[in-house]
Amino acid sequence: RGELVLSFDRSVTYGKLIKKVCDINEVGYDIKVPRQLGKNMCVPYGATLNGALVPNTVTKSLHTEKTFTPSLMDFDFRKFPNYMDIRNQIKVLSSFRKPVILIDDILHKGHRIKALDPLFREADIEIKQIVVAILSGQGKELMDIQERDVEYIYFLPNLKNWFNENSLYPFMGGDYVYREGSSDEYILPSINFILPYASPGFVRNTDPENIYTLSETCIKNAIRIFET
């Protein structure tokens, strides 16, 4: 018995997410002149659509970053460098006085939404809908527990592992690591969870040889990209 490997193109999922948000907000896909805005606002809270504008929809990104401790054994969610702290960002969202449509690329373990949910409730912000590109069975259970309504592009009931290709390639992306006393606000300390930098601890129940193969492939791909 084997495993099914699926690849998702970000540009395709972006287009489908934007259409779904427009449908929920009951607005057209083309920008109207003069502007005719929907009654809900769109809030990307991860990397997906961050900094983008949804047609005919008030769009305001929530700038958060998954941040690992120096030991790489734990992480939490903090403001992205050079932005206000998350609580103040949410207060800004509250000032619009509009129901919110939250957007992210995937809802699986739900660490980010679990960290943000108490802050949204504290600010008394109405979450009209959560929209994700990919929803797993575990993510759906979490939304049932939080009594949140979630829409998705793709539903994967049995998702084993999720890889963000960009974060695995050295010098091209990575996961943010908090460093005490770091003075450069424009170069973020980061780590790629591949060997020899760090072991991908989220990959379990597999032959160690597979970890070496994954790491080697990522490094070779990064080299090829830099050479082109």
Question: Where in the sequence are the language-model features?
Answer:
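PRPP-associated nucleotide enzymes
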Residues: R1-T228
